[in-house]
Amino acid sequence: MSVNIDLAFTVTGVADEPQAWAIVRALQELMHEEDIADQVTIGVAVDDAGSYFVSGDSDFPLGISRFYLWQPHFEGVFAATVAAVAAGAEPQVRWGYPDEEY
């Protein structure tokens, strides 16, 4: 059974702009490997304190089969991907369930 899922994420604790773009490139590769690259937008921004961060979200709900298995897999490889590029960065993945929202 598949469900519609909204994906959003942020990566904070980024050292500088070059590191932020390195994280973006690594996450774009991950999205390609997970076959959702064409459905997820990723970018770099600066918060009010002047710190760089990476954020992204799905352009529309993703149809995921066996989400209960894929979710922990994705969260694990997401965290590992970020850690490989920026060990001190803090990734956060958020899920939305549009079919349950009224």
Model-predicted segments: where are they?
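Short, extreme N-terminal segment that most often corresponds to the first beta-strand
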Residues: 1-28
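Short linear motifs in intrinsically disordered/low-complexity regions
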Residues: 5-7, 17, 39, 48-49, ...
